[in-house]
Amino acid sequence: MWFKNLLTYRLTQDVPFEPEALEAALASKPARPCASQELTTYGFVAPFGKGADAPLVHVSGEFLLIAARKEERILPSSVVNDAVKEKVEEIETEQMRKVYKKERDQIKDEIIQAFLPRAFIRRSMIFAAIAPRLGLILVNSASAKRAEDLLSTLREVMGSLPVRPVTVKIAPAATMTDWVKSQHAAEGFYVLDECELRDTGEDGGIVRCKRQDLTGEEIQLHLSTGKVVTQLALAWQDKLSFVLDDKTVIKRLKFEELLQEQAEQDGGDEAQQQFDASFTLMMMTFTEFLPALFEALGGEEIPQGV
């Protein structure tokens, strides 16, 4: 269990997160298949294992892992629109009258209901790690929408979930731009060979650089004309590498082989033990990495009144 992307959320109040109580809460909204006339369903599943006995909360020391699954029927808008157009033309030709918006919308609803049972089904899972002592919820996604779907569903079953995205005191773009300009990142962090530069103007250009020396003259020239760094590939110590963007989203997270080998040694031969060992080691790494990252970005911003 190694996260590949990371969105970080701060608990603004103490939440006990007792495993037994959380298990019962998640069980009140299990994932289930779409009924014939449903577009989508959303619910919780076991992070590891299958079957009715698989726990919905994976506990490893002080850390908890949960997972949700979304199931949705895929109806391409082009297919629906073509069917609506065909039906409207048929009515207008046969009845020699104009079909207006209200009737067109009704036709569209009827066509969707007729197509739904035959639509393809897509399933997707999302994981979230809870670290109560740190006051953090970490979502394995680069999509704020997907993360909010999970958190809002968790809030629904728990009754309350006081949480907000982690923000930092200095704009990440300003910090990353300074690191590339000065050719020196914060302690423990190292600039790699990939970045995205954007002009700050309303219709400004975008420059994406991969496998390129970011200390070179070309990059420095872009920065001297006012472009800022909005994505930057970084490494932290000898433990992980990632791409950071200007909204503090961590993408393409990759743990170094030494960590993965350690997890394999700790986990032994059993799949569940391997899963538990990798999750535990990942979370222990995050307990060092995230405070260091927030500090490197100027420190975490705590809104007044929180």
Swiss-Prot record:
GO biological process terms on file: DNA recombination; regulation of DNA recombination
Cytoplasm among keywords: yes
Molecular function via GO: double-stranded DNA binding
GO cellular component: bacterial nucleoid; cytoplasm
Subcellular location(s) per record: Cytoplasm, Nucleoid
Residue pairs linked by disulfide bridges in the UniProt entry: none
Family: Belongs to the RdgC family.
Name of the protein this chain belongs to: Recombination-associated protein RdgC
Organism lineage: Bacteria, Pseudomonadati, Pseudomonadota, Gammaproteobacteria, Pseudomonadales
